[in-house]
């Protein structure tokens, strides 16, 4: 007698994941990777957790967010045409409405492109490129009868300048008199220079005197000097003096050690950023990097290397965190610790531009723009090497003050790491689960081990075969650390992925899925 045979039962397997490997938006996102993320964090890696809160510390009520800078005593920023210090407008200081470059030395902050200086401790400001024009009297300071002059007299000519300033004269009909000279003394309305500086004595009309300042596009402070770059040129100030950019003093031994310095690097393209590191200053173009060596103008030199530079609109992305320089390059986020830069952003899976960045000491926060006209705030954890994506926060600048990280957007200045997360909307979407097999499978159940704050909730959903439809499994309310099993209506599929959406603060400690094989595709 022939008896029917029953089909062999397909094996049931259970896979438990406790290591969530951060954000990975590539098509080949591995099992365990997180393909999409909103308001997540790698702080508790290998666990997944939601990000800390943010607080709008200084609301500005709209206006162009033009730059944020940290100084002793607080935060300095520009919104529209107004300069603010710790939330208070600087009375009388009206700037051009546009992005700012800040640098500070000795308590004096320089602001480009306005070429304004500001002293936060005194609340004073002025032009960093003062100028005077009019008729001058060229004379000799010793009242002798020589033919050449060393002094310039005119009403008000002394007001904009200081003893020791290097000032530039223009307007002379005798070309040899046009040039830059150092003021040796000021006697009332008389500027005194080196003997026989000018070719003749007498009155001269239409003369302009200026203490010049370069129009920098990027700037930083290192070794008691401000360093700046633009186009193909690098400058630094006189040692200890943020207002002296063309002070080229020399003696019998050559250029003095305190003199200013500048150089044209002579390569195509414009500088796109600079930064001070523990070992020196680095200047970058999109396709190259220059490191500064030397201790004084006589031995300063820039050594070039063909390496990943800074993306042309990402000069604000250069940040030193954990003794490493991070920045957005044309090929994506990169880092260097003194050697050749390496890419670290392949997991982001997209091209990024217009980056601005900051650090809280261990994490690098990057706000950048993608080709789909979307903004993202990505966070790179320097300890674990994992990425996370927070949201669409569009920061124009970051600053760190008293150990806290701040960022500026059109609504004002935000403090990171504080504030309520009770209404925080978050999302985690896994990559495709294929369970190491090209055959079909059926998902039988999902088990989550969660920890959530009071008032928080998490909803789980599944999608099959990339059909765009999410099937809700269950919603889990807040609670202490616990496991929750979610039943699934089995469905034969080639692959599937899971999505967790939450409100409030929560952590995912493990994700277990029970599956059975469902035979090959036909």
Predicted regions and their residues:
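Short loop/turn segments that connect beta-strands within the blades of beta-propeller domains
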Residues: 71-72, 79-80, 105-106, 112-114, ...
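Structural motif
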Residues: 81-84, 117-123, 233-246, 287-293, ...
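Beta-strand initiation motifs
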Residues: 126, 200, 255-257, 297-303, ...
């Amino acid at each position: 007698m022939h008896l029917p045979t029953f089909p062999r039962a397909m094996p049931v397997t259970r896979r438990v994941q406790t290591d969530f490997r951060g954000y990975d938006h590539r098509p080949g996102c591995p099992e365990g990777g997180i393909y999409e993320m909103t308001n997540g964090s790698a702080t508790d890696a290998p666990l997944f957790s939601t990000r800390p809160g943010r607080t709008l510390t200084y609301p500005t009520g709209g206006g162009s967010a033009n730059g944020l800078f940290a100084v002793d005593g607080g935060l300095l920023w520009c919104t529209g045409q107004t300069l603010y210090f710790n939330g208070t407008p600087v009375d009388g200081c009206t700037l051009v409405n546009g992005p700012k470059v800040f640098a500070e030395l000795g308590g004096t902050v320089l602001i480009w492109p306005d070429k304004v200086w500001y002293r936060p401790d005194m609340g004073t400001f002025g032009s960093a490129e003062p100028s005077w024009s009019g008729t001058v009297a060229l004379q000799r300071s010793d009242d002798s009868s020589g033919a050449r002059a060393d002094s310039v007299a005119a009403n008000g000519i002394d007001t904009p300048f200081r003893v020791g300033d290097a000032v530039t004269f223009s307007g002379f009909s005798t070309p040899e008199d046009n040039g830059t000279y150092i003021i040796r003394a000021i006697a009332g309305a008389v500027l005194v220079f080196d003997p026989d500086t000018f070719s003749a004595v007498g009155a001269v009309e239409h003369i302009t005197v200026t203490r010049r300042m370069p129009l920098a596009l990027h700037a930083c402070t290192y070794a008691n000097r401000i360093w700046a770059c633009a186009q193909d040129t690098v400058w630094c100030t006189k040692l200890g003096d943020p207002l002296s950019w063309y002070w080229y003093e020399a003696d019998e031994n050559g250029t003095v050690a305190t003199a200013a310095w500048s150089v044209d690097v002579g390569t195509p393209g414009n500088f796109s950023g600079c930064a001070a590191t523990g070992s020196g200053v680095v200047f970058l173009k999109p396709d190259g990097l220059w490191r500064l060596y030397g201790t004084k103008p006589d031995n300063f030199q820039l050594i070039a290397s063909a390496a990943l530079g800074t993306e042309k609109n990402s000069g604000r992305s250069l940040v030193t965190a954990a003794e490493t320089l991070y920045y957005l390059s044309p090929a994506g986020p990169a880092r260097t610790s003194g050697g050749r830069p390496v890419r670290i952003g392949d997991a982001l899976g997209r091209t990024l531009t217009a980056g601005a960045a900051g650090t809280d000491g261990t994490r690098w926060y990057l706000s950048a723009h993608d080709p789909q006209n979307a903004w993202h705030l990505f966070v790179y954890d320097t300890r674990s090497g994992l990425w996370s994506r927070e949201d669409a926060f569009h920061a124009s600048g970051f600053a760190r003050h008293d150990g806290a990280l701040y960022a500026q957007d059109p609504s004002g200045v935000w403090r990171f790491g504080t504030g309520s997360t009770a209404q925080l909307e978050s999302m985690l979407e896994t990559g495709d689960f294929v369970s190491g097999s090209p055959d079909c499978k059926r998902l039988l159940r999902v088990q989550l081990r969660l920890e959530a704050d009071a008032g928080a909730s998490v909803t789980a959903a599944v999608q099959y075969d990339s059909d765009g439809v999410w099937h809700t499994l269950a919603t889990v309310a807040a609670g202490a650390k616990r496991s929750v099993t979610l039943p699934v209506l089995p469905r034969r599929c080639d692959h599937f992925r899971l999505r967790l959406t939450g409100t409030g603060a929560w952590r995912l400690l493990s994700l277990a899925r029970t599956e059975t094989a469902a035979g090959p595709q036909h």
